[in-house]
Regions:
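An N-terminal hydrophobic leader/cap segment in hydrolases
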Residues: 21-76
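The serine-hydrolase catalytic nucleophile loop
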Residues: 105-118, 131
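Alpha/beta-hydrolase active-site loop
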Residues: 111, 142-163
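Hydrolase active-site cap/lid region
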Residues: 183-238
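Conserved alpha/beta-hydrolase "acid-adjacent" motif
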Residues: 266-272
Length: 355
């Protein structure tokens, strides 16, 4: 009996020791994981963004390919940065307006050249430019639209100094360019309207969908750790709030804004763009929903839908938005369609999009 008790105590002591060992191993794993996620990994995420910015895509074509006259221009900007772009004059003696047009992150002006060609063909004059840190423009770290927003007023001033501006003046951007256009429209007085094609609402949208930091983007404090690591590499002291676009669009009280989103955009998701639209107080806001379009397909998937919506917006801008009530009804149809598509995705069903 005494021997059985002794054996039982030995087994209990052995299991107790194993429990302690397992607990210590779990604690070490937790500490190691925390150190990796919050200290060792954020610099890797930051470095991938810096390297992507350093690896610039070369220009492979010019407006000449499309039979357009153009002029290479260099535009002085803030922080000593010089922007590079193409000035495309209108074929009309009296241009219908002036459009400043730019691209998305880690790209160059070629990404939006198709839009520029279309707009010039419709009678507008267009300055299409490389955002700072991209293409042939001067060096600058990617700042999620904070520094890039200064590119638009710099371009507007450049044209105004040469008396090249014909009203209305429109800021037009795609992806990061759309973010920059929205920020610039709030902070400067040059623009009469904004066209925001596929804007990303937050830093989390980008990190969680386009970087190696995606698996940890949902963890509290991870994005802040990435921004601190990015600050050490670039000198940009940014916060998540700095890169939140929602407070920006809430300040757009009168400026007409055209939002464009694609049904299958996995980066600037349509429901997120719809939220930006919903929180924009301007009475002349519009939302265009392109069926089946991914992030870089809004213009090419269904060009007729894109071009028609864009020209209606620009025409109404020149005419003072005479049929505002009509478009309110159309916007409600667009929003209901978008909400239906989002609901179908969430339920795991599929449905042919409306064309």
């Amino acid at each position: 009996m005494a021997k059985q008790i002794k054996n039982s105590q030995l087994h209990k002591g052995k299991y107790q020791w194993l429990k302690w060992l397992l607990g210590i191993l779990c604690l070490l794993a937790l500490l190691g994981g925390t150190v990796f996620i919050y200290i060792l990994f954020p610099p890797v995420v930051a470095e991938t963004i810096v390297k992507a910015s350093d690896h610039r895509q070369p220009l492979t074509e010019t407006p000449k390919k499309f039979g357009l006259n153009y002029e290479d221009v260099l535009i002085p900007c803030s922080e000593g940065v010089t922007l590079s772009g193409w000035w495309l004059p209108s074929p009309l003696s009296k241009p219908l307006g002036t459009i400043l047009l730019t691209h998305g992150v880690f790209h160059n002006r070629e990404q939006v050249l198709n839009r520029a060609v279309f707009l010039v063909g419709k009678g507008y004059q267009v300055l299409v430019f490389d955002q700072r840190g991209n293409g042939l423009s001067g060096n600058s770290p990617v700042s999620g639209g904070l520094l890039e927003a200064g590119d638009f007023p710099a371009c507007a001033k450049y044209l105004a100094d040469r008396r090249w501006v014909r009203q209305p003046l429109i800021y037009f951007g795609f992806s990061l360019g759309a973010i920059s256009a929205l920020r610039a429209g709030v902070s400067t007085q040059y623009a009469q309207a904004i066209v925001a094609d596929s804007p990303l609402p937050t830093l989390k949208s980008y990190v969680s969908r386009r970087t190696i930091g995606a698996p940890f983007a949902w963890l509290p404090g991870f994005l802040g750790s990435c921004l601190k690591a990015y600050d050490l590499k670039t000198g940009l002291a940014l916060t998540e709030n700095d890169l939140d676009l929602m407070p920006v669009v809430k300040q757009i009280k009168n400026l007409p804004v055209l939002y464009i989103t694609g049904e299958r955009d996995d980066l600037a998701r349509p429901e997120e763009v719809q939220q930006l639209f919903a929180h924009t107080p301007s009475p002349h806001r519009r939302l265009v929903y392109i069926p089946e379009a991914g992030h870089e397909e809004t213009f090419t998937k269904y060009p007729i839908v894109y071009e028609k919506s864009l020209m209606e917006f620009l025409t109404d801008l020149r005419d003072g938005f005479p049929d505002a009530r009509k478009y309110e009804e159309e916007q409600m149809k667009t929003i209901k369609l978008l909400e239906k598509q989002v609901s179908m995705k969430q339920k795991g069903h599929s449905e042919q999009p409306m064309k």
